[in-house]
Regions:
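Short, surface-exposed charged micro-motifs
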Residues: 14, 163, 237-239
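N-terminal cofactor/phosphate-binding cores enriched in small/glycine residues
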Residues: 12-72, 82-86
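A general beta-strand register signal
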Residues: 9, 55, 241-242
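Cofactor-/ligand-binding subdomain signature composed of acidic, glycine-rich
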Residues: 243-293
Length: 293
């Protein structure tokens, strides 16, 4: 072991990792999965969801694996009874206050941890109508779990637009534009990076929203094709999601070395021309026939 590496134990496994490696990174390096919600590989951890907490022998409180650096010689438990009970409670509280029906990942976690939110009052659940202010994406705040990822992507983590932020505090906290002005009047540049990191579909492509409303959204039938954006020379990788031979949304892989999953408005939304009717000029024969008439 060099001075730059440290050793610790995770779920009984000896692990050696570089110093400053987070517990989450160390666990995943040996195949141990820790659930996350507010964490993303292309964003800085903000420790707000508490879903990734684990038990460390050098801490009385459970610690967030996404941001807590490994300590040499420490013993980490990622799925004991205390940790499991805490994650179950977090999932139940989230489900009692939000519509998580469109998050396949959270639905799977609810099932895996046997979370049952019915023991909490359903009066906490919000039932707001989606905000539809343009043809690009919608905002459904009754699905928002305040993970903060959209605010990060809009701010200094990617776009540096700062069009949205967390407004108010406590039960009244929500994602909002400045002074709650309509999105088209805000500083938003419609890059859609907020949609790309949203884990619950609180921010959703308008195309997906329309197809879901028509009961025609079929992710199991969709194909994903990688290509390079042709609008400029940066070389962003695009993932074209197609259904019934039509593009329904565009994403970008978070591990892409050029943009880390972030795109501009052209890359994310400038694809409708692909499906526009193609103009076919009349042939010489058709033109001659028109003249004769």
């Amino acid at each position: 072991m060099t001075e730059q590496n440290i050793s610790l134990t995770i779920d009984g496994q000896a692990v050696t990792v570089p110093k400053e490696t987070t517990i989450l990174e160390a666990a995943r390096s040996v195949g141990i999965d820790i659930p996350t919600l507010c964490w993303a590989e292309n964003l800085t951890p903000v420790n707000v969801c508490r879903l990734c907490v684990v038990e460390a022998d050098n801490s009385k409180a459970l610690v967030p694996a996404c941001s807590r650096a490994c300590d040499a010689g420490s013993n980490i438990e990622t799925s004991n009874e205390r940790v499991t009970k805490n994650r179950r409670m977090v999932l139940e509280l989230l489900d009692s206050a939000n519509d998580l029906s469109q998050s396949e990942e959270l639905q799977d976690l609810m099932a895996n941890y046997e979370a049952d939110s019915s023991r909490y009052s359903d009066n906490l659940a919000a039932h707001d109508e989606p905000k539809v202010e343009d043809d690009l994406f919608i905002r459904a705040y009754d699905r928002c779990v305040l993970c903060y990822k959209c605010v990060q992507a809009c701010g200094e983590e990617a776009q540096f637009t700062f069009a949205i932020a967390i407004a108010n505090r406590g039960f009244d906290a929500r994602v909002s534009t400045e002074h709650d002005i309509p999105l088209p009047e805000s500083a938003c540049v419609y890059c859609g990076n907020c949609i790309g990191v949203c884990p619950t579909n609180a921010l959703q492509f308008k195309t997906e929203f329309d197809l879901r409303s028509a009961a025609n959204w079929r992710p199991e039938d969709q194909e994903v094709t990688e290509t390079i954006c042709s609008y400029c020379g940066v070389g962003c990788t695009l993932e074209l999601h197609t259904q019934d031979n039509e593009i329904v949304k565009v994403t970008s892989p978070a591990d892409h070395s050029v943009t880390s999953g972030h795109l501009c408005v052209k890359g994310r939304f400038g694809w409708e021309y692909v499906q526009a009717p193609v103009y076919k000029p009349p042939s010489a024969k058709q033109m001659d026939a028109a003249v004769d008439d």
